[in-house]
A protein has these predicted regions:
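Hydrophobic beta-strand positions that form the internal "hydrophobic ladder"
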Residues: 72, 115, 156, 204, ...
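Repeated scaffold domains used in trafficking and secretory/extracellular systems
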Residues: 52-62, 102-107, 143-151, 188-196, ...
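Short loop/turn segments that connect beta-strands within beta-propeller blades
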Residues: 87-89, 128-132, 170-174, 219-221, ...
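Residue-level detector of Asp-centered blade-edge/turn motifs that repeat once per structural unit
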Residues: 66-68, 110-111, 151-152, 199-200, ...
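A short beta-strand motif characteristic of beta-propeller blades
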Residues: 91-97, 133-138, 175-186, 240-242, ...
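Beta-strand-rich domains and repeat architectures in extracellular enzymes and scaffolds
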Residues: 48-110, 262
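Extracytoplasmic electron-transfer domains, predominantly the class I c-type cytochrome c fold
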Residues: 1-35
Length: 321
């Protein structure tokens, strides 16, 4: 039905006037055919793809007169370039090539000097705004969703559809630090719907697309322990449990009723607001307790990654495109 008649929420046109019912059925069958073997993309593969710019030399200060903290990036998806604009005059300071099909959510280092750009085919590019030069790039996945930077600017998380992993990169060296297989508590291998930074919590938050779970991955060396199952303790400091994770990149599982496709947070990052795959409702998950605290109708296909919350007449409200 979607191929034949389109989906208004995505501005996708229908193809019923170009494809016969038999052709549409064949196309659906092809799309739904699972891969015979899921391709791997390991730490070694990522490291081998790493390509640092040989002509890059860091500068002690910006090489242009504009305010380096008032820069606008224009992501040109049609021809795979990014334009760097002076935020005051909108003069073009540089225009540089990017990998194919760049995602429109570049991430800046805390000092605003470096920007990291991800393409849908898994390439991550590091660009130095001060020198207006590319630092380097590597391929963190084969089909990637988005990226997030840690609160301290040390780590970059890459959410992947293929393979089903979360890749952690060093923002300093552009080297892979860890590749986490995204496997739900019930053993389901899952794609990552999206990953975002939760700065107050010193963690990455990601939603699993194929399993009803939210993950919190710590960027704090003192995080945890996080337990996957029940914890049994008869006395103080005598915990009996299996599968606990703690420290840097420790994972905490938060079960939800159904998989979430997109989400965002309230201003203090205590609550996550997510939407289900069918686009019929939203849920509010408290990240401290891990429980659902509210449910609200969200028909259509809201893009919660661009949502916002604020206080209005003493009530906390939200808006999302």
């Amino acid at each position: 039905d979607i191929i034949a008649h389109g989906r208004p929420a995505t501005q996708m046109m229908g193809f019923s006037d170009q494809l016969s019912p038999g052709q549409i059925e064949a196309l659906v069958a092809h799309i739904q055919t699972p891969l015979e073997e899921t391709p791997a993309w390991t730490v070694d593969d990522i490291q081998a793809s790493r390509d640092m710019a040989s002509g890059y030399t860091p500068a002690a200060k910006p090489t242009f007169e504009a305010d380096p903290l008032n820069i606008t990036l224009v992501v040109e998806t049609g021809d795979h370039h990014v334009s760097v604009l002076d935020g005051d005059t909108f003069d073009v300071l540089d225009r540089f090539p990017t990998p194919y099909a760049v995602h429109g959510g570049p991430k800046f280092s805390p000092d605003g000097r470096f920007v990291f750009i991800m393409s849908r085919d898994g390439w991550v590019q590091k660009y130095d705004i001060w020198t207006l030069k590319e630092v380097g790039r590597l391929r963190a996945g084969l089909n990637s969703r988005n990226i997030a930077m840690s609160h301290d600017g040390q780590w970059l998380a890459v959410a992947n559809y293929l393979p089903q992993t979360l890749t952690i990169l060093s923002t300093d060296t552009m080297e892979p630090v860890k590749v986490i297989d995204v496997v739900a508590h019930n053993g389901t291998l899952s794609r990552v719907s999206a990953v975002y930074q939760a700065p107050q919590r010193k963690s990455f938050i990601l939603a699993l697309k194929d399993a009803p779970e939210i993950w919190e991955v710590a960027t704090d060396p003192d995080a945890g322990p996080f337990h996957d199952g029940y914890v049994h303790s008869y006395e103080k400091d005598a915990v009996e449990a299996f599968g606990a994770q703690e420290g840097l990149f420790a994972r905490r599982r938060i079960p939800v009723d159904e998989p979430l496709d997109d989400f965002f947070f309230d201003p203090d990052y205590r609550n996550l607001i997510g939407t289900n795959r069918e686009g019929t409702k939203g849920v509010v998950i408290n990240l401290i307790s891990g429980g659902k605290v509210a449910e609200l109708p969200l028909p259509g296909m809201p893009h919660l990654g661009s949502g916002i919350t604020w206080d209005w007449n003493g009530v906390k409200v939200m808006a999302t495109p």
